[in-house]
């Protein structure tokens, strides 16, 4: 259980004990549901988001804007952005970030299909929405440089969370908040 992301030793123990207390039929149903999900859910052939179809629902949706592509590291990022209901374009999931320490270079990500897609579709804008970790920044800069010859490249703004206090923010977050400032409407 500890191999699951975000599951530490205590949570793993709680989950294991809970499963052991459940009737065997429930445990088998859970195991079967996991196996079925693994079999039925793959990656969209266009954007590499999770999908039970060859092309995901977002890419198939005729109401989505084709002239804007939002590049994210992971399908969890698509889900988070979709919850805002603000982005009306399409996505491209890289499948991670460049992380030499973990053996992940550009070749292990879906950067080549992204370049091909941008070259063919010629969107007006590509938005890079990658977390501002060291690896995320590296990925953003690398992908941004590759895309600049083809289209306008922007990145999402970073700054203070809603309800956050200035005194608790680190210097980098405050600096980015100042850089990303905009005029009041």
Curated annotation (Swiss-Prot):
One of its GO terms (molecular function) is zinc ion binding. GO terms for biological process: DNA recombination; DNA repair. A zinc finger (C4-type) spans 44-59. Residues 67-161 form the Toprim domain. InterPro entries: DNA_Rcmb_RecR (IPR000093), Rcmb_RecR (IPR023627), Rcmb_RecR_Znf (IPR015967), TOPRIM_dom (IPR006171), TOPRIM_RecR (IPR034137). It holds the Pfam family RecR_HhH. May play a role in DNA repair. It seems to be involved in an RecBC-independent recombinational process of DNA repair. It may act with RecF and RecO. Belongs to the RecR family. This is Recombination protein RecR. It comes from Trichormus variabilis (strain ATCC 29413 / PCC 7937). The lineage of its organism: Bacteria, Bacillati, Cyanobacteriota, Cyanophyceae, Nostocales. The gene is recR.
